[in-house]
């Protein structure tokens, strides 16, 4: 007698919605048209014990959100569903996302909405500056959606935000996390060389072999060149780059990626675990053990990065001020039971 194997074909889905100006496409509607199709996840991998965040103050989280809504501002913390949001907001920090909340790219790892963005908000630079001042920030991170619809990719808007913020908070350090400005690199670098941040950050996201699947519309070498050329123009400004693990890369590919970043004049590195925002996004290939993250940090220090933070919950702007000042990466939060099972619990 043989056992019948029952297979279930995915139910037919409606055609994905078309992009309409000002409307965000998320989940299936966002990723349905990328070159390498995403098969919806039926059962997600169980998260290990080291995927944890600290409990936070609900009152402080509510205060930050209220301030942001009053100023009509967005944060990548909220739009990208960052798991560290409660901890960072409770600590009085947030990463401002300028140029709206609609991205012109369709990266299947990211939860930021895709579509046809609205025109830039001319008041956003002032509102951002007022919020930085109102929160009393000493270190601010400003990022953006990709704006392939703009001739300069939004670089001039970054400059306006920098100028307005420094006028109101001259002692606040500002890190900008920029898109790749593909097709617009020269004009963008001209603008951001003249009006420079304290840290120039651009995320390369993954290893080159996985670019077609996870970064459609982007180019690995272009991102490396962006970082290198900026550092050549402004050697006095710290450069920074982040990427994810758990997408299907190998450990050897990560070491090669770190070598590439070092060869392209990057000073600081962040490495974090990819977490799937929804069943329609790219699935998690594996959960990387904290010991592997430690090997990446050890290697990064060996080849000469000023600082490298690598850990399950590390994100590009995670305690960015601490990394800038040279502090070591916080250890992941783990249960005593799990540590004991691995023989790592002291007497």
Swiss-Prot record:
Please list the cofactors this protein needs: [4Fe-4S] cluster
A GO molecular function annotation here is: metal ion binding
Q: Which InterPro entries match?
A: Aldolase_TIM, Elp3/MiaA/NifB-like_rSAM, LIAS_N, Lipoyl_synth, rSAM
Q: Which UniProt keywords apply?
A: 4Fe-4S, Cytoplasm, Iron, Iron-sulfur, Metal-binding, S-adenosyl-L-methionine, Transferase
Broadest EC class assigned to this enzyme: transferase
What EC numbers are recorded for this enzyme?
2.8.1.8
- Where does the chain bind [4Fe-4S] cluster 1? 77, 82, 88, 317
Where in or outside the cell? Cytoplasm
Q: In which pathway does it act?
A: Protein modification; protein lipoylation via endogenous pathway; protein N(6)-(lipoyl)lysine from octanoyl-[acyl-carrier-protein]: step 2/2
The entry's protein name is Lipoyl synthase
